[in-house]
């Protein structure tokens, strides 16, 4: 598919025949990750399809690294992904019957809002809006020292 304003989407379907058994074909694209791949998955907590930040991270980072966006962009992105990873760990603890800490519970609540407000494919925000929403989520669920972002950026953006 070619887009009028530039860019394209190319899909190449691949099927793996495990052991050559044609009766058990497995659709597979894991061995064919290409430039520009964004990994989508259904988030069971919010019931929407999201851009999976863990599997899409290199593609998402290339939109930030060395680019002219807001000076807080790289640190906000790194903190958000780290907190989202902490939530994934907390979810694993919960599913395995371990007690959750207050921090674990806050990361789970953060992850739900983060997925719904930023990662869901029905979200359409520009970079400034995305950063502002993320700062709002940080200040809603965490203390400034928990997000591990430079103090000057926290002072400029926290709770605004």
Task: Label every PLM stretch briefly.
Residues 1-159:
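P-loop NTPase catalytic core
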